[in-house]
Design a protein with these regions (language model features):
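Acyl-CoA/ACP chain-elongation machinery
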Residues: 16-17, 22-24, 28, 74-88, ...
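Active-site-proximal alpha-helical scaffold in enzymes
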Residues: 1-18, 50-84, 127-133
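Conserved small/polar residues in nucleotide/adenosyl-binding loops
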Residues: 172-174
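Conserved catalytic cysteine-centered active-site region
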Residues: 1-11, 19-51, 90-119, 150-152, ...
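Condensing-enzyme catalytic core mediating Claisen C-C bond formation in acyl metabolism
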Residues: 30-31, 39, 62, 71-75, ...
Length: 174
């Protein structure tokens, strides 16, 4: 976007790829933990899922157990996936299944069950960004309302676990 705004490019291709299925579960866990603050969260039981479990526990302590809400979200997401021919997971899982701990839906890192967590899989996405004059001549185009880059404090010990200040800040100027 910077290159287009500076008139150094008229069209750009942005590509993102993630290949996770060719490495061991241990390696995947280590890669994902790279998105946390390793000096403090590197040994968290359950790995990166354990970091989110810590956040969920703090949220439940503050607002009450909301496991049923997580199950409703999981069931809704699976239902939406069934309606999307491009969705990775196209299997309907009902609320009762998502809200129960079982052999097929165990705790990954309590209180998070398998249906509360994303799958380890491969994926890719691409986006073409164009100068407004070129984009307006296309049959289908979108415009960005805003663009924002913010940082958040990574160590959970240095912030309120139930708040994501970076996400909040990113919405200020929309």
């Amino acid at each position: 976007m910077n290159a287009i705004e500076a008139k150094k490019a008229k069209t750009t291709l942005v590509v993102g790829v993630e290949k996770m299925t060719d490495v061991s579960s241990e390696r995947v866990g280590d890669i994902l933990l790279g998105a946390s603050y390793r000096p403090e969260e590197g040994d968290t039981k359950g790995g990166f899922t354990g970091v989110f479990a810590t956040i969920a526990k703090s949220y439940f302590q503050k607002y009450g157990d909301k496991s049923d809400i997580l199950a409703k979200i999981a069931a809704k997401n699976h239902e939406n996936g069934c309606a999307n021919p491009f969705a990775h997971m196209q299997k309907k899982l009902d609320f009762e299944f998502c809200n129960s701990v079982s052999e097929k839906n165990p705790y990954v890192a309590e209180p998070l069950r398998r249906t509360d967590c994303s799958m380890v899989s491969d994926g890719a996405a691409a986006l073409i960004i164009q100068d407004i004059d070129i984009a307006l001549s296309a049959k289908r185009a979108i415009a960005f309302r805003s663009r924002r880059h913010v940082n958040d404090i990574l160590p959970l010990s240095k912030r309120e676990k139930t708040e994501f200040e970076g996400a909040r800040l990113s919405l200020i100027h929309i």
